[in-house]
Each structure stands twice: as structure tokens, then as C-alpha cells.
Amino acid sequence: MAFLKKSLFLVLFLGIVSLSICEEEKREGEEEEKQEEENEELSEEELRERRAWLDKLKSLGKVVGKVALGVAQNYLNPQQ
């Protein structure tokens, strides 16, 4: 009888230990997934921000180009 009790306690103890280890690994996996999702979201936000800056820079370049073209035309063909 004592042997059965010890065996039962050993089985229960090992089961609880393995269960807690599995839960800990599961939590770590979930945390890693959340971090990966956040990194992906940040990447998407950064891409949007970069695109917006590139669009603004492109527009600014067009304006500067038009102004430079106008100045060059006025310099080469002065109107009297």
C-alpha cells in the first residue's frame, strides 16, 4: 500500500511539473508571437511613413524643378 501511495505521488508530481513546463513554454511562444506581430505592424507603419515622406520629397522636387526651369527660361530668353 505504501508503495502504491509513493508511486501515485510520484506520478502526480511529475505530471504537475511537466504541465507547468508546458504552460511556461506556451506562454513564451505566445509572447514571441506577439512581439513578431508588433514588429510587423511597426514595419508596416514605417513603410507608410517612408512612402509619405517620399511622396512629399517627390512633390518638392517637382516644384523646385519647375522653378529652376522658369528661372533658366527667363535668363536665356529675357523679355524686354
From Swiss-Prot:
GO terms for biological process, alphabetical: defense response to bacterium
Cellular component annotations (GO), alphabetically ordered: extracellular region
Pfam families: FSAP_sig_propep
Tissues expressing the protein: Expressed by the skin glands.
Domain of life: Eukaryota
Signal peptide: 1-22
InterPro entries assigned to the protein according to its UniProt record, in alphabetical order: Frog_antimicrobial_propeptide, FSAP
Transmembrane residue ranges: none
Subcellular location(s) of the protein: Secreted
Keywords: Amphibian defense peptide, Antibiotic, Antimicrobial, Cleavage on pair of basic residues, Secreted, Signal
Propeptide: 23-49
Job description of the protein: Has antibacterial activity against the Gram-negative bacteria E.coli ATCC 25922 (MIC=5 uM), P.aeruginosa ATCC 27853 (MIC=10 uM) and X.citri (MIC< 2 uM), and the Gram-positive bacterium S.aureus ATCC 29313 (MIC=20 uM). Does not have hemolytic activity against human erythrocytes.
Family that this chain belongs to: Belongs to the frog skin active peptide (FSAP) family. Dermaseptin subfamily.
The protein's name: Raniseptin-1
Species of provenance: Boana raniceps
